[in-house]
Amino acid sequence: MPKAKGKTRRQKFGYSVNRKRLNRNARRKAAPRIECSHIRHAWDHAKSVRQNLAEMGLAVDPNRAVPLRKRKVKAMEVDIEERPKELVRKPYVLNDLEAEASLPEKKGNTLSRDLIDYVRYMVENHGEDYKAMARDEKNYYQDTPKQIRSKINVYKRFYPAEWQDFLDSLQKRKMEVE
């Protein structure tokens, strides 16, 4: 199809436009990424935040959701019954969030593999002799006997079952040698 006739002018750079402000405003208006996957999948971009959260059964403002009780004015039982319950159209989001919250928390603190190997090596070769451990050539960081003892105690505290298995294996080795 032929091009429509008319004046075409070249694009000129707009020097009068403040690009810094334009970019800042664009960043402010851009919708943030919703971290919670349950909420993100149920989100309707055509609706407002308040409408979306109301459909999911979540509160926009926690202060309004659970207000402080006022001691002077007591609500009558009739008033409480007359208040309409909000309709929850997406209850599965609320159920998923509650199920996720009820799961046991993962143990986040662990020791590095290097520290575990270091402790095992020291105990394997020196037993309870911390001074000999401090003089060992594998003591790269030149830990003092007390520092080595504390590292071993940390290992015992973090992995008590593994520590017991390790000690049992050492006992078996000693029995085999004798």
From Swiss-Prot:
One GO cellular-component annotation of the UniProt record comes to:
intracellular membrane-bounded organelle
Q: Which residues carry this modification: N6-acetyllysine?
A: K90
Q: Which family does it belong to?
A: Belongs to the NOP16 family.
The PTM Phosphoserine maps to S16
For this chain, one GO molecular function annotation is:
RNA binding
Which location does the Swiss-Prot or TrEMBL entry give for the cross-link Glycyl lysine isopeptide (Lys-Gly) (interchain with G-Cter in SUMO2)?
K74
For the modification Phosphothreonine, which residues carry it? T8, T144
Q: Which InterPro entries does the entry mention?
A: Ribosome_biogenesis_Nop16
Tell where it localizes: Nucleus, Nucleolus
Alphabetical UniProt keywords:
Acetylation, Isopeptide bond, Nucleus, Phosphoprotein, Ubl conjugation
Protein name per its UniProtKB record: Nucleolar protein 16
A Gene Ontology BP annotation from the UniProt entry: ribosomal large subunit biogenesis
Region entry Disordered, spans: 1-31
